[in-house]
Amino acid sequence: MAQKINPLGFRLGVTQNERSHWFAQQRNYSKDLREDQKIRTCIENYVRTHIKSSSNYGGIARVEIRRKIDLIKVKIYIGFPNLLLIEGRGQGIEKLRNDVLNMLDSVDRKLHIAIEKVAKPYRKPNILAEYIALQLEKRVPFRKTMKKAIELAEREEVEGIQIQIAGRLDGKEIARVEWDRGGRVPLQTIRARIDYCYYPVKTIYGVLGIKIWILEE
């Protein structure tokens, strides 16, 4: 039988690196892990509600978190940085930092947030998934959306991409799974640099699940 496994965890330490860098005692591990999830959720919600790009979606590729005793360093990799999120050009980062600190409810720790622009945003599965979700919310046909997403990725010179959408597609009564692929995506090879994301999107017909695998050069 085939075994399902997360492609990022499968390659951790070989071609993928950790998104969180810290050590904790056993009694504090679950607390810090939940805090990491809260920080990522707070950043994503802030970008979606306050900082809209010209493409009408946030474009967060990934969020890396590093912890020290009294300092939390957060680096946001974003595809389409708004001027408010560029350091020294607005109050966006300061407001985001205050929102995260209020959410953590901690006064004895410092928080540093840095922004880094992604050179080729459509090589990142999270940004492509957000683009697909936006099109599905606008009731664009899912096959047309998948082909357009593959075209955008191929313009960024990816070696291969696979997209899968599951749910009540086009409002049909029976849920199903549809997928499309461009290039090669060897999921069984650990040495292949596969980037992956899962992105749920709410539509008027229900929740659709988007999965994207991208083979980097």
Swiss-Prot record:
CDD domains: KH-II_30S_S3. Gene3D superfamilies: 3.30.300.20, Ribosomal protein S3, C-terminal domain. It is found in: Plastid, Chloroplast. GO terms for biological process: translation. Residues 47-119 form the KH type-2 domain. GO terms for cellular component: chloroplast; cytosolic small ribosomal subunit. Keywords: Chloroplast, Plastid, Ribonucleoprotein, Ribosomal protein, RNA-binding, rRNA-binding. One of its GO terms (molecular function) is structural constituent of ribosome. Pfam families: Ribosomal_S3_C (PF00189). InterPro entries: KH_dom-like_a/b, KH_dom_type_2, KH_sf_prok-type, Ribosomal_S3_C_sf, Ribosomal_uS3_bac-typ, Ribosomal_uS3_C, Ribosomal_uS3_CS. Its main location: plastid. Part of the 30S ribosomal subunit. Belongs to the universal ribosomal protein uS3 family. This is Small ribosomal subunit protein uS3c. It comes from Pinus thunbergii.
